Amino acid sequence: SDVYKRQVIRSAFDSAGQRCSALRVLCIQEEIYDDLVTMIRGNISTQALGDPNNFDIDIGPIINNKALENLNNYITKCKRKGMEVFQFEGKESNTHIYPTIININSISDIEDEQFGPILHILKYKSNEIDQLIAEINDSGYGLTMGIHTRIESRADYFGSMSNVGNI
């Protein structure tokens, strides 16, 4: 839905993704994967980079040059590993990174937490939910988790089995 898409974009890319609670991994059930990813990609291609004091700017600068270099190196490394990387290509910037989507096959594909406008997307099958929860629990990350579903029992199950700080 449109509301869900906006929540994903805001959670992943507000503050240029430099919040400890920013969305880092979006796990999408395969039945809705293609449509949702298409909507998210379409939205990030409209994000404006610049001074966040300006009302019409969506993505502010990366905190410093070292962080910017690390994020760019991470994106390059993911491309070299053969991961599908989607990044809207706009005007070059020495202080910003365009919102980036990296498709992953497993939570373990993420080596380190990236504090920037990078969203990892993982497609999963509904019958693999226990495996997905185990991967999340084994990842070492888990400050926050959001669960969006129309099936309340699935949300309850996912939440009760996940070792995270906040849901």
Features from the language model and the residues they span:
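ALDH superfamily catalytic-core signature
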Residues: 1-105, 127-130
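Conserved C-terminal structural/oligomerization subdomain of aldehyde/semialdehyde dehydrogenase
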Residues: 80, 96-167
